Amino acid sequence: MAKIVTLDLQNPDVLPVWQRLLQTLGLQNFTPAEVAHLDFTLGLYEDQQLVATASAAGNVIQYVGVDNEDQVSGSRFNTIISAVTNRLFQKQIFHIFVFTKPQYSRSFQHVGFHELTRSPQAAFLETGTPDVHDYLAQIPDFPAEVGATIAGIVMNANPFTWGHRYLIEQALQASDAVYVFVVNTDASLFTTAERQQLVEAGTADLKKVIVVNGGDYMVSYATFPAYFLPSTEATIQYQTTLDAQIFRDIIAPACHIKVRFVGTEPLSKTTGIYNQVLAEILPPQVALKVIDRKKDDQNHYVTATQVRQQIAAGQLDDLASLVPPSTYQFIQRHAQELHQRIQKGQQIHGN
């Protein structure tokens, strides 16, 4: 008799059974960080044997595995995916994503998922609402004239610096209008709402700039599961490929974006890989323009990482040369809270 149960992966008797099933299906990476990120894991048992499993982290389904040695694998897949989506519904999560191997995409489509994009290594699908069409519908339109050049920029802005402002200004000089998409993941020192607020405040005087929340479609490193990929660098490259394809095929056409601007990345290997993949994926539909990073008076690159490091060190006096007044004032008002976040373990390095 088939039964769905919640699997406690902290239980030393349960974890190896779960891992063995997934390993037989080609999933090998079970880092503590990946497993700890899961909100819950379900298992389908038949005759006391684990024959299917699926997990969820936030609104992303992960670690899906189904024993397909017999002819009931389709039924098992439907059962476990129905169970995990119903559990998410109970948690008031009605918009659900899955990253999976491309060969499993059709199975997810049979149970109501829609494929957003795929690469040779991974497919990205969604189900529920608000979906990608709802996201696109809420993006403001530019009343652009025929032949106008509309540009796009995607930034984390953690926080918004003079470097970010410089990139936007350079895009404006070469374009008729600019969309600035703020990455929508609360995995940074500054929350998503704070980062978007600072970008809006720091560009308030710039006409023909629209600041937009990136939603769930500027795919985040924080939500992309690495368990079926061979290495960290491969994870970045494959995730970025999906991200670039979504921008090229979905976001850019809806917003009439013809060119995307990025800054050079002499200091960040991760973002350097990101820019390289963008250059391979975006053209010819979307041109890529790379702008040299802004430097300060001492000929040092202006980076958000440096700003965060100075916040951590309590060195706020020098920040005025790195960030616009609106960002500087925000940091001064919230310095204690930001410092508390750092003390609680919020990372300040990286992008």
Describe the role of every protein-language-model region.
Residues 72-88, 110, 164-169:
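Conserved acetyl-CoA-binding loop-helix of GNAT-fold acetyltransferases
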Residues 55-56, 86-91:
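Beta-strand-enriched, solvent-exposed domains that form extended recognition/catalytic surfaces
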Residues 91, 99-351:
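Nucleotidyltransferase catalytic core that binds NTPs
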Residues 1-32:
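Short amphipathic alpha-helix that is part of the acyltransferase structural core
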Residues 38-52:
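Conserved beta-hairpin
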